[in-house]
Structure formats: structure tokens, C-alpha cells
Amino acid sequence: MPLLSRITGPADLRRLHPEQLPPLAAEIRAFLIDNVTRTGGHLGPNLGVVELSIALHRVFDSPHDRILWDTGHQAYVHKLLTGRQDFSRVRAKDGLSGYPSRAESPHDLIENSHASTALGHADGIAKADQLLGVDRCTVAVIGDGALTGGMAWEALNNIAEAEDRPLVIVVNDNERSYAPTIGGLAHHLATLRTTKGYERFLAWGKDALQRTPVVGPPLFDALHGAKKGFKDAFAPQGMFEDLGLKYLGPIDGHDIAGVEQALRRARNFGGPVIVHCLTVKGRGYRPAEQDEADRFHAVNPIDPYTCLPISPSAGASWTSVFGKEMLALGAERPELVAVTAAMLHPVGLGPFAKAYPGRTFDVGIAEQHAVASAAGLATGGLHPVVAVYATFLNRAFDQVLMDVALHRLGVTFVLDRAGVTGNDGASHNGMWDLSVLQVVPGLRIAAPRDAARVREHVRQAVAVEDAPTVVRFPKGELGPEAPAIERIGGVDVLARTGPAPDVLLVAVGPMAAACLDAAALLAADGITATVVDPCWVKPVDPALVELAGAHRMVVTVEDNGRTGGVGAALAQAMRDADVDTPLRDLGIPQEFLAHASRGEILEEIGLTGTGVAAQTAAHARRLLPGTGTRPGAQEYRPRMPLTDWSEPA
């Protein structure tokens, strides 16, 4: 009987004989390769933590002891060992989350997949346990480059303050985040990997001196006072110990017995301890181990033998179009530089970095520093393009506001994965950036609808030298081009379905396709519409306000939360201009969305052509006397109630 099928929880794991653990590890790797290559997901990080996860659940009593996974994408093995072995729909609608999920299991305590936060959680949990008299250990596993984030070091500084608070920090050191980890800390950890001789030398010296008659013990005591100097010279773990943190390691993270021994020592110490484990991302799957780009960090469904995509891409992606345009701009403008935060390839900067390595700055998982450093680059006379996932720019809002916008600096932010992302769940949806950035004075935002507009808007953005600019686009493949039939001011008119249209459909970026489909459906229902793309959604173009006044109703459609988004900004601009046309804003509900595909989520929240048409028709029938009704039309019921404004916005 396979070992894995006998594991329904950590207690079953602890009953296994040590000789059974390597076969179990091999079984888990085979399971991961078989399942994750079929469904897609984070393969490389999880192959690297198999033995570490086994050891953690054998030494600590989860969920009584708290095990926290920083970033969380390396928690697949943890899920398997805590009774969740149905990976057939991992990251799919109604399947397991690709991250820890409190709704799934009491073994999952935190589920935020943004990096460098687990140590802060662990600090607070350990403090709460101490104050409430709860006897248990808190364990935080951090790796995949998360120690390059400043939050982790802020937490370490506080954790070290209490020497009697049981907290174990496991550093999963695989030398990588998405790609190889960069920066001084990476070099420091690399140094620790190569100084095993220090501990052997110290142990030999202690033994030899203490066995020497008369002078041995006093001499050892004197030399022991010089321990810090030896450590700083030979093994820089002194950096951790100078903070007041006990350091154990480095340890082979694939040696279960060795990891268990270190974890038991750490647990019994009773204070904050760092256990430094050396692991190999992609361990046990040769294609992953040989992939120098990212060790199969995250894969789409692939053939496990050929590693070819199960469903080859049918066209270019938003990311690839941006990457090619950056490469072209780099050749034209020597002052253009690229900045990213540990995601060079995922945001499309790989070609630029290869062509211009000296003009590419990957700062690690440190978004705040990325933006502040970009401000410095702009102050120095360069034009930085900061490319990150939309959800991660939230982490650097203060730097955008105070270090870039306040100084009126020409910094361009390119936000990949904007709007509904889908499979990676709530924390990866880029559904807040349009709302958050609306409040930044002077900042301009473009939302391209197709490949041509990506190229156009990126070029326009990097030409602005006296204010920050933003270009946002979603994850995935591009749809067909949506050419304009007319441009009014800076607004592209995409379609008119009648000589005097009733409704102005304002399509934000990739919502253009849904709005064009909706306009056709509405025309069949007797409701005529003009479909426009504002292109630059902040500030609101006066031409858009004039167009709103020329229609009987305005409907904005955006891949962003409704609160504070483009619809809200247009409503305010209309009020300021005394335009009393009723406005309805369609967008993402103000809630954390469960994981599912982008298409499934857009359909569920009504941001497809059918959904937009149904909601628009319902409002039009109520607000616009004399509008037609398509026979057999069904009322659309959104997940959350739409704002019912009986009076004009």
C-alpha cells in the first residue's frame, strides 16, 4: 500500500519508521510531478521542500504548534501531509487553493501570498501565546527570496528582543525566488553555505583545550571571548546572533534525520532560533533542476516528459508585447532603465535584461525599495520603468505618493496581472490599483485594450518626464485588435449602433471586447449604444464628460473594484461639469474573490458581454422610457447589488 495514501494527518506521519521516510518523500515528488504538470501550479518550490515539510510535521504538533508558510506557494507538501490529497483541481474553481487556506484546514493559519510577512505574523502570535499563557511553539518557514524583503528584517529585529519566547524561523535557502536571489543577503547566505569548517574547527578546539591539564580551561575561556571575532571572520552567521537569534546550520534540507535533529534542538531551546536549511528548488525532477531561468517555479499544464505545453499558446500575451516594446525603446533611448522586484521574467523584462544588463535592476522582493530607488534614478536623469504585478504595487503606495509623485518625477509603472487574475486567488487579483492610484496627484493611468494600444501607451508613458505614469494590463493572451472608428479628444470611439445612441458604454482597457459584444446584444434589444475607450483613464478626459452629456445613460465597465475606480472618477467629473446623465458603474465586487479561472470569475460577476448587456438593459428599462425589450430576455442577477441611484450622479 502506498505510504502517502496512509497519511490523513501529521499523527500518521509521526508513526512512520525513519526508514519509511525517504520512500515517502519519493512518493510525494512523483505525486507532485504527476498532478501539477497536469493542472499547472507552483512545481519547483514544492519539490524543494518535501523533506523539510516531512520533518516539520514530525517534530511539531500542528495545528497546536503554529506552522506559518511565508508566501505560501511552497505549501503543497504541507497540504498533502495534513489530509488534503485531492489535487485534481488545485487552483481551479471549487478545488484546493494553491496557497494555504483557512477555509480548507485548521493547519493553515495565514493565507496571504505576499512575501516577507510570515515573520511579522509569527512575532505577534508568539507574543499573544506568551501573554495568554499558551504553551506552544510558533514556526515560520521563509525562503524563495522572501528574506530580501525589508518587512522580514523589521520582524527579525523585534523577534530577537524576547529571548524567552519560543519561535523557530526556518530559512529555506534555495538561492532563488522566481529566478536566482540577488543582493547582499544572497551573498551572505551563500557564504554560510561554504563555511562548514568553522563549526568543526570550533568543536575540535574546545575539545582539545578542555582536555589540556591546568592551562586548558582558562585558555579556552579566554579564547571563547574571542568567539565573535572568529565568527565574523569565518562564518557570518554572527549577523543573526548579533541580533540575539540563536543560529543552527547550515543543514542539508533534504536530509530528513538531520533536519529533524535541528528542529528538535530549536524547539527545546525555548527562545528565537534560526534553522538554516539548504534546499534545491525543483529537486528530483531533472527538467526543473536544469531550468536556470526559474526551476519550474510556476508551470502551466505540461507534458511531464517533454515539458511541452498541453495547450500551446494561440497568440501573443500582454506581457510579451510589453517586453518587445521595452526592448525596442531601450535601443532608442539610452536613458531608459528597467526596475523590478524579483520577477524579471514574469513581467516580460527578460529580453531587455539580456540586451541591457547594466540598465536592469532586480531589487529582490522589495517593492518599496524598487519605487524609492526608481525615484533616485529619475532624479539622477534616467527614466525608470518599474514593472511589477498590479497587486504588489499596493505594498509601495507611500513611495509612489511621496517619493515619486510629490517630486514630480518621470517614473513609469507597468502593472502586469491587473484586474482579475484568477487561479492564484484573492491576494493575486490586481483589483485595487485603479482605486488606490486615483488619489495620487499628477499621476496618469493608461489601460490599453489591445496590443497596438500597449505599444502606444508605453511609448506615451515613458515620454512623460514631469509626473509618474502607469500602464496596466491583465494576465494572459491578447484578443483581436479593436480599432477605433473615431477619436474625440483622447477618447477612442469603437462602435455606434444607431444614429443617436441611448447609452454610452465606457470600456476600460480589456473590457472593450465585452462592451462591443454587449452593444450588439443591446441593439437587438432595441437599445442603441456608443462604445468608447478613454485610453488614459486618469485624469478624466473632458471629451469623455462631453460624450456623457450627449447620451441618456452612461455605463462604465472596468476590471477593478467599483469603489474609487474609473466609474467613480467619471461620476465626480460629471458632477463638477453639471452633467446630469445617470451613470452606472460595473466592476469587481468589493470582496475577496475565490480562486477560479479569469473567464469563470468575469462571467460570475457579470463582466462578460452577456452580463454587461443584461445589467445595462435592466437599468435602461427603468431609467429610459421607451427603450425596447428583447423577447425572452432574462434578468441578470449580480453577486452583489448594484448601486441603485434613482437620481443622476
UniProtKB/Swiss-Prot annotation:
Domain of life: Bacteria
Pfam families associated with the record: DXP_synthase_N, Transket_pyr, Transketolase_C
CC cofactor: Mg(2+); thiamine diphosphate
PROSITE patterns associated with the record: TRANSKETOLASE_1, TRANSKETOLASE_2
Binding-site residues for thiamine diphosphate, renumbered to this chain: H73, S113, H114, A115, G145, A146, N174, Y285, E367
Annotated region described as Disordered, given as residue ranges: 623-649
Keywords noted in UniProt: Isoprene biosynthesis, Magnesium, Metal-binding, Thiamine biosynthesis, Thiamine pyrophosphate, Transferase
GO cellular component term of the entry, any: cytosol
Enzymatic reactions: D-glyceraldehyde 3-phosphate + pyruvate + H(+) = 1-deoxy-D-xylulose 5-phosphate + CO2
GO MF entries: 1-deoxy-D-xylulose-5-phosphate synthase activity; magnesium ion binding; thiamine pyrophosphate binding
Gene Ontology biological-process annotations: 1-deoxy-D-xylulose 5-phosphate biosynthetic process; isopentenyl diphosphate biosynthetic process, methylerythritol 4-phosphate pathway; terpenoid biosynthetic process; thiamine biosynthetic process
Pathway(s) annotated for this protein in UniProt: Metabolic intermediate biosynthesis; 1-deoxy-D-xylulose 5-phosphate biosynthesis; 1-deoxy-D-xylulose 5-phosphate from D-glyceraldehyde 3-phosphate and pyruvate: step 1/1
Binding annotation for Mg(2+): D144, N174
Cited InterPro entries: Dxylulose-5-P_synthase, THDP-binding, Transketo_C/PFOR_II, Transketolase-like_Pyr-bd, Transketolase_BS, Transketolase_C, Transketolase_CS
Cofactor note as given: Binds 1 Mg(2+) ion per subunit.
UniProt similarity note: Belongs to the transketolase family. DXPS subfamily.
Complexes and interactors: Homodimer.
HAMAP family given in the database record: DXP_synth
Function as written in the Swiss-Prot or TrEMBL entry: Catalyzes the acyloin condensation reaction between C atoms 2 and 3 of pyruvate and glyceraldehyde 3-phosphate to yield 1-deoxy-D-xylulose-5-phosphate (DXP).
Name under which the protein is recorded: 1-deoxy-D-xylulose-5-phosphate synthase 1
Organism name: Kitasatospora griseola
